[in-house]
Amino acid sequence: MVNQFATALRSRKPIGASFEFGLAPDSNINRATDSATLDTIIAPLDLSRDARQTSGLGVRAAGQAYLRAPLAKDLSFLPRVSGQGVLYRHSAFNDVSASAQLGLEWSPGRERIRPSAGASFRWYGGQLYARTATATIDWQHPLDGKSQLGAALTAGTTDYRLNHLQDGMLWNASIAYERAFDARSGGGITLVGTRQTARDPGYATVSGGVDLLYWREFGKTSAFVTLGGRRLEGDARLFLFPDRRREWTLSAGGGATLRALAWHGFAPLVRVEFERNWSTVGLYDYRRVAGTFGITRAF
């Protein structure tokens, strides 16, 4: 859905949106460890059942929309909104987020430059978990008829409502290269770096990673595979734990949109993803397999 929305946003359409709805089975809905106890500097810590790995079947809905309103030659007003949520029978694991951005799009020649400011909110278990205010600038530059380069810089402030020791600044930078291999296939590579500060240096982190994407059209079926890797380092150790956070994360996924079975523009969607996080702090060490089986549509 994100790729559908990004494609529409890169076009000159004055309005665009995408929507997704489906069932979402997940082996680890809370991205938690499967260990019953954790080692601490005092004594082994027993974890409650809801603090450990929990599987579940959720209902997932997500949507995004934008409006492009011309202000002058090569300049448009560009508001964007998005939201997504996964709801479970056990509401303590419900995960909902929403964001809104107001910005401009400047299009000198073939370039696209978009400065924007916005806010995002996340609710977990029915409670406001975090809110973030951000300022972003992204740039897109076609290299030739088959490839393009993109870059983005974001600065923001984060406010964690349940633990203010995590509050701090958020900095993110990314650069992406996309290429069409032929009329029916293509791919891309994205490099990402993130810095997050916090009142407690144990929650402050720096991370970097790479994401790979390959997509291909098979008749009226759009298929894709993804692969990603990420490294994270904590500034200091968290209270109770003997080591500071040092993590490797591996993610992989694949899916397909079956347009041959579309009904009134809504097409079946199948997506499967795998995630494994190795951490020196047992609380963050987990594995996860999840899927989405639903419908999607881009407008």
Enumerate the language-model features and the residues they cover:
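Gram-negative and organellar
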Residues: M1-F299
